Curated annotation (Swiss-Prot):
Keywords: Cytoplasm, Fatty acid biosynthesis, Fatty acid metabolism, Lipid biosynthesis, Lipid metabolism, Phosphopantetheine, Phosphoprotein. The keyword Lipid biosynthesis applies. This is Acyl carrier protein. One of its GO terms (cellular component) is membrane. The lineage of its organism: Bacteria, Pseudomonadati, Pseudomonadota, Gammaproteobacteria, Enterobacterales.
């Protein structure tokens, strides 16, 4: 089983079409990885599906970096 971090990074690579080595924990989806607002919405939806969780809109707005996504999933896994 892959770690949460590995799974989150895999989703980011697939959703944003970036190279795996570009996906650093500190990377911002918009500034560093070139995502636009639609990309970030699709990314949140993919994370919800992968981890069978719901990310409320107010929380989704705070998920702007790779680490923020990892932290949210870690904090909200059953």
């Amino acid at each position: 089983m892959s770690t949460i971090e590995e799974r989150v990074k895999k989703i980011i690579v697939e959703q944003l079409g970036v190279k795996e080595d570009e996906v650093k924990n500190s990377a911002s989806f918009v500034e560093d990885l070139g995502a636009d607002s639609l990309d970030t919405v699709e990314l949140v939806m993919a994370l919800e599906e992968e981890f069978d969780t719901e990310i409320p809109d107010e929380e989704a707005e705070k998920i702007t970096t790779v680490q923020a996504a990892i932290d949210f999933i870690n904090a909200n896994q059953q």
